[in-house]
A protein has these predicted regions:
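Basic, amphipathic alpha-helical bundle interface domains used for macromolecular binding and assembly
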Residues: 33, 39-44, 59, 66-76, ...
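Peripheral, non-AAA+ core regions of ATP-driven protein-machinery
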Residues: 1-218, 225, 331, 471-472, ...
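P-loop NTPase nucleotide-binding/switch module
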Residues: 170-209, 213, 240-295
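The Walker A (P-loop) glycine that initiates the GxxxxGKT/S ATP-binding motif of P-loop NTPases
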Residues: 221, 285, 307
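Walker B catalytic acidic pair
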Residues: 300, 306-307, 318
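Walker A/P-loop
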Residues: 219-260, 325
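Short beta-strand elements
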Residues: 18-24, 283, 387-390
Length: 515
């Protein structure tokens, strides 16, 4: 006898339909072909125990199971369920009439319970594209997969429920998710708000400019000045995720196994804050299985690197290409995958090894040479990709106790959304450019030229402040964003002056002056 069931293999964001073919003849051997990894090859023992513990006997026969296409590597335990169902059907223990209508995915426990798998959302998208009537997944993956419309998704607890459903002896109902209502209901439900931050108005302004133009930003200041506190509130002032952005972001988190039970589409921009001990593989992705790293999990959101100089220098250097290309290609001997990673890079750091350089309330014990060596842990090419460099001084206690609550995140976000709308219209016909931070030199010449007074201020600043040549285009990009926030088509001298103030680390005398 011969039976087929259907499942899927996930490789990066690409999903391939896999046909599980099972043939039964006389004999006692079990053969599994189709380039499966160790987890797939071990499925025989899990399936045999699951069937036995649910009242079935594993067939005493020569069984050949093939995962087609045979040249595609199959990874993970999600093939357990389609293999088990095919074995039961080929042995005559269940009906095979409806197997072609459904895609199956799930790991089997020894007791027959279905355990969650990674990548349920992209698999559901593939099932719809292949015109399957429905998708059967573990109960824990049900909500995640059901965000895909025009596809019936059935969450099952164990293999017996799957058998009864496919035999037509149970009336399981597909999971129904009101995707749009859930998505929009949670968009603005932030736990953190900028109204919690007392003082630091200049830093809030820098973060608003960064959010409005999609600019990468670094904050330099002593411990306790509020760097991390403000960075964590940045997602609350960014433009809300669109449904298409959310779907792409959620797929990445699904592949990484980061979607919890009962969770659907990600409704807020991701905020990822890896520890400074993170490895290169954990940061950019890869490993034995090509899983997305932190930069891809931050796609369409924020990647925050706290205490930037404490990161391994080689680890930081791998950020350079993803920051430029907004995608990462991971190539290994057995696979090549590409993940998107378009994120805002936000970093914080102390100004010196002791942390108190320029702090009026503490004495810095570092020499200029020590400060310079500390700063040299961050390479020029990486700093070149950071548009805004913002210095932070601690808020004095008397000001902290008297300061009235500042603007809410919602008020700031309204201005950011208006500025982004201007940029969307400006770059409507420019492929791959959505905000000012992504402008090329040609686009800078076209859209970011200041008036004569502004150009003169920029020339003087370049000479007197010893600004590096790489700061020139960054200043113009940021000035363009400041003008957009004010609704000005022309970049004025005031916009240039503010943008110049955000290039502190490019000044040649940085280690010889106070904050």
């Amino acid at each position: 006898m011969f039976v087929k069931t259907f499942c899927a293999a996930v490789n990066g964001l690409e999903v391939t339909t896999v046909t599980v073919e099972v043939s039964l003849t006389r004999g006692v051997l079990y053969h599994l072909t189709g380039l499966g990894d160790a987890a797939v090859k071990e499925s025989h023992d899990r399936i045999a125990a699951a069937l036995l513990n649910n009242g079935y006997k594993f067939p005493v026969a020569d069984i050949t199971a093939n995962l087609s296409p045979a040249d595609l590597k199959k990874e993970g335990s999600g093939f357990d369920l389609p293999l088990a169902i095919a074995i039961l059907a080929v042995d005559g223990k269940m009906q095979a009439d409806r197997l072609a209508e459904y895609m199956l995915v799930g790991e089997l426990g020894l007791d027959g319970q279905l355990r969650p798998v990674k990548g349920a959302l992209p698999i559901a998208i593939k099932a719809r594209a292949e015109h399957f009537k429905g998708l059967i997944v573990p109960k824990a993956n049900e909500h995640e997969a059901a965000v895909v419309d025009k596809l019936d998704v059935y969450g099952m607890n164990n293999i017996l429920e799957v058998v009864n459903f496919l035999n037509g002896s149970s009336s399981s109902e597909p999971c129904v998710v009101d995707t749009r209502r859930e998505f929009y209901a949670r968009q603005y439900q932030f736990d953190l708000d900028f109204s919690d931050v007392r003082g630091q108005e200049s830093v809030k302004r820098a973060l608003e400019v960064a959010a409005a133009g999609g600019h990468n930003l670094i904050m330099i200041g002593p411990p306790g000045s509020g760097k991390s506190m403000m960075a964590k509130r940045l997602p609350s002032i960014l433009p809300p995720l669109s449904l298409s952005e959310s779907l792409e972001t959620t797929q990445i988190h699904s592949i990484a196994g980061k979607i919890g039970k009962g969770e659907g589409l990600i409704s807020q921009r991701p905020f990822r804050s890896p520890h400074h001990t993170i490895s290169e593989v954990a940061l950019v992705g890869g490993g034995q299985s090509p899983l997305p790293g932190e930069i891809s999990l931050a796609h369409n959101g924020v990647l925050f690197a706290d205490e930037l100089p404490e990161f391994n220098k080689h680890t930081l250097e791998v950020l350079r290409q993803p920051l430029e290309d907004r995608q990462i290609t991971i190539s290994r001997a057995k696979y090549t995958v590409t993940y998107p990673c378009s994120f805002m890079f936000v970093a914080s750091m102390n100004p010196c090894p002791c942390g108190y350089y320029g702090d009026p309330t503490h004495t810095c014990v570092c020499t200029p040479g020590q400060i310079q060596r500390y700063m040299n842990k961050i390479s020029g090419p990486l700093l070149d990709r950071i548009d805004i460099q913002c210095e932070i001084a601690p808020v004095p206690f008397k000001d902290l106790s008297k300061a009235a609550p500042g603007e809410t995140s919602g008020q700031i976000r309204e201005r950011v959304i208006k500025a982004r709308a201007i940029q969307t219209e400006r770059f409507n016909e420019v492929k791959g450019v959505h905000c000012n931070a992504q402008m090329s030199e040609r686009l800078i010449r076209q859209y970011a030229q200041p008036d004569s007074e502004g150009l003169n201020i920029l020339r003087i600043a370049m000479e007197r402040l010893k600004l590096s040549a790489r700061a020139y285009n960054r200043i113009l990009k940021v000035a363009r964003t400041i003008a957009d926030l004010e609704g000005s088509e022309q970049i004025l001298s005031s916009h240039i002056a503010e943008a110049i103030g955000y290039r502190n680390l490019d000044r040649g005398d940085w280690a010889e002056r106070g904050l």
